[in-house]
């Protein structure tokens, strides 16, 4: 389709929001296919019995504490998976034996309709969604009661014990909350063609936003302008927004993995790490690009320093080689290890790492010294959540369980595919491949302080050399990759490498 260009003037600065080469697709295009019932059938096939009732609540409207304003709405992903419904205050049941999907929409509220417009009604829901029956919410309790009376020995499958559709009174309901999540996760981790198209659409919006930022980077003075333009382009292209909080970290902020303040000036800094992805129809993209700040570059060069260019080249090599290894049957943990092997080789070449007298390269590997500069996993599953479900998400490592108990981790955290116990990659999985190298002052100073301790990482670090790289901050490059039977398909089209530099410098 033909690309288009929209020029916006802000405070005397001309910004071309959609530069040539950005994703110029039909904004009026609608997502006409709803695979909700197909997904419900897939889930049912994974349950222990091919009889029973599945119940899932959608996200309800919730007010912020001590406020009359609604919290930002985000549809519950498990509910969306079997309905495709994006509106709030809905519920769904699926009678497995009868193959009947019933959607419950909010009861009509005259006052609410006057103030905020009509909620999803029965006729509209019947036209828009692939369901067998639509009822108002007030019918839910009676329907479940009658189903239970007719099927007294069958289970009602729910995700969590606190998500019961009816409080047991006169009927002995058999609620089963152990099987449904495992079944849904097993289905969600393998994307069908419709889901892949939605993830690719999200990536196209992300690509357009990243292009716009690169083309207009020379106008910007603050991280906030980068983050703001990304959201602007996403909304303009009919995305509901971003799939997660945008990370626009300049200078040392780029060494903080999930930096989201996005409010500091760009002046005097070399690089920006921009981790920002659009959402499309509840499906996420997750894209990271690292690029030089034009005001820090002089003399016709592309990079603000030799150190920045070197680190970018290493991360680029890490990503390219790792993506080439993604295929059905591969162990992502092994690909993750390959990324660390490249980091070790290259950091030794730069003199950032060293092999002390009496030590060997194997000692550096055993000490996991590269984790000082590459402290996160190579990637994660992607889908309805940016950190999407895994096939074995019901169990998590002990150390993660401890973090969850401390309140440091959501209870919905899923096992990443780069753990040793994760199953091999399978066709239909979508994963991120996001190697990075970071020069985090806190981590470096701690390693320096502990360098004389046995088994410390600092023993293998040349801290004088490291200081030359601290101003780089960090570099991360991230793409969303579909695993296929023949290898993989990269779903991300945001510029990187030479194409990225050409956009920044208008070449």
UniProtKB/Swiss-Prot annotation:
Keywords of this entry: Aminopeptidase, Hydrolase, Manganese, Metal-binding, Metalloprotease, Protease
The protein's required cofactors: Mn(2+)
EC number(s) given by UniProt: 3.4.11.9
SUPFAM superfamilies assigned: Creatinase/aminopeptidase (SSF55920), Creatinase/prolidase N-terminal domain (SSF53092)
The organism's place on the tree of life at top rank: Eukaryota
Entry's Gene Ontology molecular function annotations: manganese ion binding; metalloaminopeptidase activity
GO terms of biological process kind: proteolysis
Enzyme class of the recorded protein, top EC level: hydrolase
S-adenosyl-L-methionine recorded as keyword: no
Binding site for Mn(2+) 2: 275, 286, 478
Cofactor binding comment, as recorded: Binds 2 manganese ions per subunit.
Disulphide-bridged cysteine pairs: none
Reaction(s) the record says it catalyses: Release of any N-terminal amino acid, including proline, that is linked to proline, even from a dipeptide or tripeptide
List of residues binding Mn(2+) 1: 286, 434, 478
Manganese found in the keyword field: yes
Family affiliation: Belongs to the peptidase M24B family.
Purpose: Catalyzes the removal of a penultimate prolyl residue from the N-termini of peptides.
Protein name: Probable Xaa-Pro aminopeptidase TRV_02643
Organism encoding this protein: Trichophyton verrucosum (strain HKI 0517)
């Amino acid at each position: 389709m033909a690309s288009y260009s929209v020029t916006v003037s802000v405070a005397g600065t001309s910004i071309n929001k959609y530069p040539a080469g950005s994703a110029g697709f039909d904004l009026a295009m609608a997502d006409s296919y709803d695979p909700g019932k197909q997904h419900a059938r897939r889930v049912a096939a994974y349950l222990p019995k091919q009889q029973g009732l599945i119940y899932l609540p959608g996200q309800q409207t919730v007010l912020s504490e001590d406020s009359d304003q609604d919290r930002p709405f985000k549809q519950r992903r498990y509910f969306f998976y079997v309905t495709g419904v994006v509106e709030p205050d809905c519920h769904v049941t699926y009678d497995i034996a009868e193959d009947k999907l019933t959607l419950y929409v909010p009861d009509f509220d005259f006052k609410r309709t006057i103030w905020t417009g009509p909620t999803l009604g029965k006729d509209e829901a019947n036209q828009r969604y692939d369901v067998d029956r639509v009822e108002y919410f007030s019918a839910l309790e009676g329907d479940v009661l009658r189903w239970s009376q007719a099927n007294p020995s069958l289970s009602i499958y729910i995700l969590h014990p606190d998500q019961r559709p009816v409080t047991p009174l006169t009927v002995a309901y058999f609620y089963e909350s152990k099987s449904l999540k495992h079944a849904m996760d097993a289905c969600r981790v393998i994307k069908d063609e419709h889901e892949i198209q939605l993830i690719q659409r999200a990536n196209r919006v992300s690509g357009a936003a990243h292009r716009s930022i690169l083309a207009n980077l020379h106008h910007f003075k603050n991280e906030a302008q980068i983050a703001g333009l990304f959201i602007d382009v996403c909304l303009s292209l009919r995305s509901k927004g971003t799939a997660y909080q945008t990370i626009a970290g300049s200078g040392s902020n780029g060494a903080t993995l999930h930096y989201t303040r996005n409010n500091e000036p760009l002046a005097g800094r070399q690089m920006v790490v921009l981790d920002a992805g659009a959402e499309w129809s509840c499906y996420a993209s997750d894209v990271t690009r690292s690029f030089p700040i034009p005001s820090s570059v002089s003399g016709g060069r592309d990079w603000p320093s030799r150190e920045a260019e070197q680190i970018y080249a290493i991360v680029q090599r890490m990503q390219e080689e790792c993506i080439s290894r993604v295929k059905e049957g591969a162990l992502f943990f092994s690909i993750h290890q390959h990324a660390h092997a490249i980091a070790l080789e290259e950091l030794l070449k730069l003199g950032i790492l060293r092999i002390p007298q009496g030590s060997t390269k194997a000692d550096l590997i055993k000490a996991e010294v590269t984790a000082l500069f590459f402290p996160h996993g190579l990637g994660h599953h992607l889908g309805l959540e940016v950190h999407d479900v895994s096939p074995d998400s019901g169990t998590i490592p002990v150390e993660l369980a401890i973090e969850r108990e401390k309140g440091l981790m959501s209870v919905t955290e899923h096992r990443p595919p780069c753990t040793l116990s994760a199953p091999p990659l399978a066709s239909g999985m979508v994963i991120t491949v996001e190697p990075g190298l970071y020069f985090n002052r806190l981590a470096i100073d701690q390693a320096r302080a502990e360098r004389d301790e046995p088994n410390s990482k600092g023993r293998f670090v040349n801290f004088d050399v490291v200081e030359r790289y601290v101003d780089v901050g960090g570099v991360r490059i991230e793409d969303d990759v579909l695993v296929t039977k023949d290898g993989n398909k990269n779903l991300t089209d945001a510029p990187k490498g030479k194409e990225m530099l050409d956009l920044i410098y208008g070449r």
